[in-house]
Regions:
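Short linear regulatory motifs enriched in tryptophan with gly/pro/ser
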Residues: 1-185
């Protein structure tokens, strides 16, 4: 059985990854793949928080047993059978840095090794870029979403102000057409 998983950052539209993962894949194997693909630090404790469709916590899985088992004992199949629909994957527990992993469904007829999840779709840079100030176009406020070559409403307002500036310059000319010199400028 192969599952489709969507990895997202909460509140950010400009980032996602879609993986095709064998049901026999352990959470530890998934962790190693995510850490590699998304360039997460290797020296941090990790945790998978399993949630049901209502958002209730079903279990927590880490490198050490947190009461529900360790990441190398729990396969994706077992988690889905237990009712898990979403994981919050903390790749840096200390600093509470996480991504959301949603189980989108089964992929019939697809064969994938349990040892290597397949990255099927990708959008946006890695999460570290968002921490460094990167803002995806989709996440910009509507008034800042202007493509090159398009005019925004603000550009039209600026043109009106430029016309007023020209009128003021014309008023500064003397009656005989000579410009008046002002020392304060």
């Amino acid at each position: 059985m192969v599952f489709s998983l969507r990895v997202t950052l909460t509140g950010i539209k400009g980032f996602f990854r879609v993986y095709k993962v064998n049901g026999a894949t352990t959470l530890y194997t998934l962790h190693k793949q995510l850490r590699s693909d998304l360039e997460f630090p290797q020296d941090q404790l990790i945790m998978f928080k399993a949630l049901d469709p209502d958002g209730s916590v079903l279990g927590r899985y880490g490198l050490f047993d947190l009461g529900s088992g360790t990441v190398d004992q729990v396969s994706l199949e077992k988690a889905v059978a237990a009712g898990v629909s979403t994981f919050v994957y903390f790749y840096d527990v200390t600093n509470r840095k996480s991504v959301t992993i949603s189980i989108e469904g089964e992929e019939p007829g697809l064969r994938i090794s349990p040892d290597s999840p397949l990255l099927a779709e990708s959008k946006g840079p890695n999460p570290i870029e968002f921490e460094n100030g990167y803002v995806a176009f989709e996440d910009l406020p509507d008034k800042q979403r202007v493509l090159p070559g398009e005019e925004s409403d603000e550009d039209l307002d600026d043109e009106d102000f430029e016309d007023e500036d020209l009128d003021e310059e014309e008023e500064e000319d003397d009656e005989d057409g000579k410009e008046i010199y002002d020392e304060s400028e």
